[in-house]
């Protein structure tokens, strides 16, 4: 049976804008997904040491029903600071939850541990978050750059036997359309184990 799914770029998913901030020299960065009109979110936080911000807001029992951005970042827990820059830039553009005198952008964030890859003293900060939002909203890429960019700049895999055995990973994205329905995913792959092709076993 012929598939009805059409492969598209994640930037073609309506209602979302994407931007990267990359610090090649320090080996870290952040990626932002902006929903200017807000989007309904959900959350499933896993792992033994998650570095996350505002993810509990997405639980169904809570009152906030829209998220305005998701920030993926390097820098471990320090990288959560990038989300403050995302929120600051969105507020300056009037994007967020109206609360009377201003808008409060709902920015959820999660970070990977990449401090062992590049310069551990440099982490995505407020300015990095601002730059990523400006890339998303002012330049509006038609294709999301993938690989060693954004939140995937310092990502590695194969660390189970220690740093000496690891290899480079990065930022990946995929999207499909089924008629008018579009679904996309963006991920910074920073696994402890190896990435294996299920078709070749390599």
Locations of the language-model features?
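Alpha/propeptide regions of enzymes that mature by internal proteolysis
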Residues: 1-202
């Amino acid at each position: 049976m012929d598939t009805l799914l059409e492969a598209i770029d994640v930037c073609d998913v309506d209602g979302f804008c994407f931007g990267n901030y990359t610090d090649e020299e320090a080996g870290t960065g952040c990626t932002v997904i902006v929903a200017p009109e807000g989007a309904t979110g959900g959350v499933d936080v896993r792992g033994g040491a998650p570095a996350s911000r505002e993810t509990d807001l997405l639980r169904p029992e809570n009152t906030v029903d829209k998220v305005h951005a998701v920030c993926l970042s390097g820098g471990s827990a320090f990288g959560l600071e990038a989300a403050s820059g995302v929120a600051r830039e969105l507020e300056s553009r009037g994007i967020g939850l109206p609360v009377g005198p201003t808008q409060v952008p709902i920015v959820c964030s999660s970070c990977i541990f990449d401090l062992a890859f590049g310069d551990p003293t440099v982490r995505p900060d407020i300015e990095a978050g601002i730059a990523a939002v400006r890339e998303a909203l002012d330049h509006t890429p038609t294709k999301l750059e993938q690989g060693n960019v954004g939140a995937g700049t310092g990502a590695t895999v194969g660390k189970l036997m220690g740093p000496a055995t690891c290899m480079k990973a990065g930022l990946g994205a995929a999207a499909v359309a089924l008629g008018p329905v579009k679904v996309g995913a963006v991920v910074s792959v920073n696994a402890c184990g190896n990435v294996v092709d299920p078709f070749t076993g390599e």
